[in-house]
């Protein structure tokens, strides 16, 4: 079984409409990039002032277990409101050799390169599966 593409979403207020809006933005982004299915890890009603959140902890465990190849987040504030916490988490993701895509940072050439590589890889894997 291949590695999953994950998305992490978080809202501080327990508002299902806001959470669904965040997920929809990530889904649209993934579709625009030619990315297949995305597994969501969502913390609804959790503060971004620390990293102690159930879905984020499950995502971390899955990354450490080698189950995740890419993580998509809408913006860094979804990970943490404290920029230092957010960067510590992003460094951990990088150390685990997981690609991180931040949707609302499209002008970053590294992000563009990752998205292009990921889209090409996903299409190649899809073609292999169809021709198997």
List PLM regions with ranges.
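Short, structured surface patches at the beginning of a domain
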Residues: 1-132
């Amino acid at each position: 079984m291949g590695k999953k593409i994950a998305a992490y979403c978080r809202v501080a207020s327990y508002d299902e409409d806001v959470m669904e809006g965040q997920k929809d933005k990530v889904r649209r982004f993934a579709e625009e990039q030619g990315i297949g299915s995305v597994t969501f890890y969502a913390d609804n009603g959790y503060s971004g002032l620390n990293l102690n959140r159930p879905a984020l902890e499950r995502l971390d465990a899955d990354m450490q277990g080698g189950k995740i190849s890419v993580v998509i987040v809408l913006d860094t504030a979804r990970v943490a409101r404290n920029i230092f916490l957010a960067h510590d988490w992003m460094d951990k993701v990088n150390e685990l050799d997981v690609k991180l895509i931040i949707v609302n940072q499209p002008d970053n050439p590294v992000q563009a390169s990752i998205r292009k590589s990921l889209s090409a890889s996903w299409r190649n894997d899809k073609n292999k599966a169809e021709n198997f």
